[in-house]
Amino acid sequence: MDRVNFSIDQLLEETSKLVSLGIISKQECKDIMKKREYHEIKIFNRNSHKSDFLTYIKYELELDRLFHKRGKAKNIEFDYRLRSALRHAIILFGSATKKFPKDEALWINALNIRMKRASKEGTGRLFSIALSNLPRSAKLWKLAATFEFEVNKNIQNARNLIQAGIQFNKTDKSLWHYFFLMELTYISLLFSDITFIDKKIEEEEEEAIKLNLDSLRKSEKIEKDEFITFGKEILSADKLKQSSLIRGQIAQIVFRKAIKSSIGQDFDFRKHFYKIASKFLDIGKDSENPMGAGELLQKEILESLVTDFPNDDKTYIFLASIEQSKSSEPSLLKRLNNSTKILNQGLTIIKSESYLFNYIHFIRQIIVDIKLKENKLIENITDILLKAYKYSIDNNILKESGYQYYIELLLELGKTNDAIKVSEESVKLFKNSNQLWNQRINLLIKNEMVVKLFDNLSNNNEYNNIDKCFEMAVKNCTSSTTSTTSSTSTSSSSNLFIEYFKYQVVFKFDKDYKKIVDLFEKLLKQLDEFYQKCILYEEERIEKNINDIRSLYEKCLSIKEISSKDVDVWLNYRNFELKSAGDIERANTIATRGKKSLADPLPLLSQLQ
């Protein structure tokens, strides 16, 4: 409690000065001190948490804003006495970071407050302490470099800090990106004739962030890497402005070093450099140099992507997106053609279905930006999509999913005849594909008149006969499931049977169950699941036939594996007779049969009671 009282006494002295200045009243002073006493007790408690400090700091920062606002109204906004709450908040941050030295967020909050609201005095020392505690924090290294670059106006110290951060965080991409951005920002400031104070580099500069990097490397077991070094001519703003380096060669050095690092073979890592460079396209551009720093850097970045990622889908998609977004080419049609050339080049090199999907997705996205009246452009896009699919078929690139999407596209474009032809080709190529057979059968059902015309022209092609297709699908898909015992494969086959069953019920007036059920029993292993789905489907139909449902239950229970073990089937059958059919006598008979047939009838008996 003595520590609390001592702290309160010191705070009261400073707060009383605000009363004498007329910033707050005596009653407000009492209320503030009472609130502070509450917070002081919380933070001096042995079991205090970080949240206790942050709540107290938040209160002090709110007081600082209030005092500053009232001081401004009295034209005394720059009086040092007004900043007592801010000074106290900074002291509280110091206590919090001392108690929780490994808390990254706490350090960053403390440093941001110092940089935004306080003077820079002592901030460099605080950065040194923070980095010594958390040398693996990329965020802290970036913030430290920002402080040296933007506050201290010391580009060389900023370079050294960001490179030290890279050494301690070799897999962090953001540090390399920040280094690149910082160098481009620096030359942008110089090129724009913005006054940038270029202090003389001195080892004993008072507010610079000083770190014993050798000691820190040793404690963190980090191997020493040589920093990128720069000649004296670029340490002087005046000399740099007159140099060819103003056109991005410093950033170029950073990029080349970055792609040689352990993370340099990451496509997206390199791609981000291109995006950063796009903000500095015209830096260094003049009558003698038609390309600015950003343009030159982008050119090199693209060359590196093409050279090092020649078989990566992302390379050609990215190059195509650049062509598509070029503002220098006003014609959307020309941009589309240029993008398509790049995408086609990628297709001939990569020859994979995944690349084709990316290609198609890219082209489809363009449609979103097109006005409906631009029919010519839409026709061009349609032609591009169809040619890409045709090339893929001719070169055996298309797999099951590819055919499925191609058929959907043809239907979307109103090319039903072509869709039916391609669908036939697909099931011949991929005989064991549930998805393609389902697609084929649905096509036949929905386009019966077209199919009949095809049938007359093709001498009764069995692939145009719905029943034949179902039978071929059932046989082919079931034979594949016997070799592939996964639950997914079995479920897919079962679903195919269900679709066939629905078709028989809806479209076949004679409802020839015997034919279809015989086929199921012969080919399908998990009959319980199949019958349950069929029964559920029949029970939910508006025009349900009770005898048909009974027939399915009886077929299901004729299988010993089901009748001796599956309690649910017996119970569902009994409840069906009781609730849907209203036949109590039959329901009781089924219950009795269940008790006799089940190996363990107790679960059924407990449900019947």
UniProtKB/Swiss-Prot annotation:
HAT repeat locations: 84-116, 118-150, 511-540, 544-579
Disulfide bonds: none
Any Pfam family the entry gives: UTP6_C
InterPro entries xrefs: HAT, TPR-like_helical_dom_sf, Utp6, UTP6_C, UTP6_N
Cleaved signal peptide residues: none
Molecular function terms, GO-annotated: snoRNA binding
Location in the cell: Nucleus, Nucleolus
Listed SUPFAM superfamilies: TPR-like
GO cellular component: Pwp2p-containing subcomplex of 90S preribosome; small-subunit processome
Main localization (coarse): nucleus
Keywords assigned by UniProt, alphabetized: Nucleus, Repeat, rRNA processing
GO biological process entries: maturation of SSU-rRNA; maturation of SSU-rRNA from tricistronic rRNA transcript (SSU-rRNA, 5.8S rRNA, LSU-rRNA)
Function: Involved in nucleolar processing of pre-18S ribosomal RNA.
Recorded family membership: Belongs to the UTP6 family.
Name of the protein in question: U3 small nucleolar RNA-associated protein 6 homolog
Organism in which the protein naturally occurs: Dictyostelium discoideum
